[in-house]
């Protein structure tokens, strides 16, 4: 995402992950680049309130303009504020029909990661927001 290249629905989609963050790679006086990183997509099992994507982008712009960033080369998953801790997490292949309350609870606690479930969405070139 940047100030001018973003998608409302991408912001809304990222909130359906149990853990998510923005990894900001470049900030100067006129521009920034951020990558939305999500771990453990819950989709319809997400019980969090979803904030409108336009508001999320406004919050990103406010944060970007009010935060002095130091240069760093840390991995996004190593940052202390990112609450997902994947130590000793089991990684499994599961189909949607195999999900139950216990599995979802393990996902939420970072004790289980699910892989190889195929492509979720393809936005194509729709990342550009045009007025």
UniProtKB/Swiss-Prot annotation:
It comes from the Viruses. InterPro entries: NIV_2_O_MTASE, NSP16_CoV-like, SAM-dependent_MTases_sf. Its EC number is 2.1.1.-. It comes from Porcine respiratory coronavirus (strain 86/137004 / isolate British) (PRCoV). Disulfide bonds: none annotated. The replicase polyprotein of coronaviruses is a multifunctional protein: it contains the activities necessary for the transcription of negative stranded RNA, leader RNA, subgenomic mRNAs and progeny virion RNA as well as proteinases responsible for the cleavage of the polyprotein into functional products. One of its GO terms (molecular function) is mRNA (nucleoside-2'-O-)-methyltransferase activity. Pfam families: CoV_Methyltr_2 (PF06460). Residues 1-128 form the Nidovirus-type SAM-dependent 2'-O-MTase domain. Keywords: Methyltransferase, Transferase. This is Replicase polyprotein 1ab.
């Amino acid at each position: 995402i940047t100030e001018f290249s973003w998608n409302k629905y991408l912001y809304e989609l990222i909130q359906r992950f149990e853990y998510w963050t923005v990894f900001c790679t470049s900030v100067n006086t006129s521009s920034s680049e951020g990558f939305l990183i999500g771990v453990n997509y819950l989709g319809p099992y997400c019980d969090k309130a979803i904030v409108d994507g336009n508001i999320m982008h406004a919050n990103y712009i406010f944060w970007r303009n009010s935060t002095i960033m130091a240069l760093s080369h840390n991995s996004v998953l190593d940052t202390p504020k990112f609450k997902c801790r994947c130590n000793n997490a089991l990684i499994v292949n599961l189909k949607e029909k195999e999900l139950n309350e216990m599995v979802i609870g393990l996902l939420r606690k970072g004790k289980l990661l699910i892989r190889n479930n195929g492509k979720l969405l393809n936005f194509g070139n729709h990342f550009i927001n045009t007025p």
